[in-house]
């Protein structure tokens, strides 16, 4: 038995192929989910990948949030299905109300494309259980609107509830409190700006650190 991981594609998505490859590399069966799909085809987990869904018109993730497939993703997440949003996918999850806060223009207003070091701040999620506490990960970051912001009250709640999942070592985009990724209250929904699906082989690298997220999802699905 293995997990069936759905990978969503919107018009303008760029990283669905990479996310699918990462899921296959850990032994999952990949199911392609189109933005117009009205069901999730029996998947056990969902990845909402990066790119520029619908051209990022209005604002990043604002239109994708209303795609039919997202109604199903939200409903499945409410039932406890593991969901991972990467970069634009993180923006979509925030727009959909699955995660609090928002992603805004980077400090300096420049698109950032570089490898960054992250610290795993929580291993109590469906997507980080395979990591050691405070593990360091080297993964690519590529975004123009990657600065995480939220009201102070929300930030305090995230900190107090252990829902900050990843932090930047070198905060290149100005995210409040160095936050690179957060999770839902039950730890089943995770969003992060850097790209673990681009860090699955040391040869094409920068590392294979990103595989830990996908192995963690397998554990979450297979062990419940």
Curated annotation (Swiss-Prot):
Keywords: ATP-binding, Cytoplasm, Glutamine amidotransferase, Hydrolase, Ligase, Nucleotide-binding, Purine biosynthesis. One of its GO terms (cellular component) is cytoplasm. The active site is at 87 (nucleophile), 195, 197. GO terms for molecular function: ATP binding; glutaminase activity; phosphoribosylformylglycinamidine synthase activity. Its EC number is 6.3.5.3, 3.5.1.2. CDD domains: GATase1_FGAR_AT. Residues 4-224 form the Glutamine amidotransferase type-1 domain. It is found in: Cytoplasm. InterPro entries: Class_I_gatase-like, PRibForGlyAmidine_synth_PurQ. It catalyses: N(2)-formyl-N(1)-(5-phospho-beta-D-ribosyl)glycinamide + L-glutamine + ATP + H2O = 2-formamido-N(1)-(5-O-phospho-beta-D-ribosyl)acetamidine + L-glutamate + ADP + phosphate + H(+); L-glutamine + H2O = L-glutamate + NH4(+). Part of the FGAM synthase complex composed of 1 PurL, 1 PurQ and 2 PurS subunits. Part of the phosphoribosylformylglycinamidine synthase complex involved in the purines biosynthetic pathway. Catalyzes the ATP-dependent conversion of formylglycinamide ribonucleotide (FGAR) and glutamine to yield formylglycinamidine ribonucleotide (FGAM) and glutamate. The FGAM synthase complex is composed of three subunits. PurQ produces an ammonia molecule by converting glutamine to glutamate. PurL transfers the ammonia molecule to FGAR to form FGAM in an ATP-dependent manner. This is Phosphoribosylformylglycinamidine synthase subunit PurQ. It comes from Mycobacterium tuberculosis (strain ATCC 25618 / H37Rv).
